[in-house]
């Protein structure tokens, strides 16, 4: 099993899809990396030689922000929005949808379980 950027890639998958298991790498980026390194998309992860795996590791390490670093950067960006007091930051702080969705009836994922208000018995 190839280990790239701290992630064990599934052995039987094609390398172009295997790389998408790394946080921050989608299909487009995966193909871009493989083109640059010169590896066929159809090659399976378990068929990679150690040199090819090292080349992929080097390409990702030098040119892409992935896994922990990317997660940390995203968290810092959200924290900066909250500290600024911007509208988006306030929505993050309140746990509401940030991108303009309506909240009267939907938004259950962000708002959580329903809280009944004013139920009289």
From Swiss-Prot:
Any GO molecular function: structural constituent of ribosome
An annotated GO cellular component: cytosol
Region (Disordered): 95-121
Keyword Mitochondrion: no
Gene3D superfamilies per record: 1.10.8.50, 30s ribosomal protein s13, domain 2
Keywords carried by this UniProt record: Ribonucleoprotein, Ribosomal protein, RNA-binding, rRNA-binding, tRNA-binding
Assembly behavior: Part of the 30S ribosomal subunit. Forms a loose heterodimer with protein S19. Forms two bridges to the 50S subunit in the 70S ribosome.
Name of the protein in question: Small ribosomal subunit protein uS13
